[in-house]
Curated annotation (Swiss-Prot):
Chief localisation class: cytoplasm
Record carries keyword Cytoplasm: yes
Superkingdom assignment: Eukaryota
Coiled coil: none
Keywords assigned: Cytoplasm, Hydrolase, Serine esterase
Annotated organism of origin: Schizaphis graminum
Catalyzed reactions: a carboxylic ester + H2O = an alcohol + a carboxylate + H(+)
Subcellular location: Cytoplasm
Family: Belongs to the type-B carboxylesterase/lipase family.
Protein name, UniProt field: Esterase 56 kDa subunit
Keyword Cytoplasm set for record: yes
Length: 15
């Protein structure tokens, strides 16, 4: 689930 990882990082704070 690469999309989930990218979305999670962006929502978290652009990790």
């Amino acid at each position: 689930n690469p999309v989930v990882r990218i979305t999670n990082g962006a929502i978290r704070g652009q990790n």
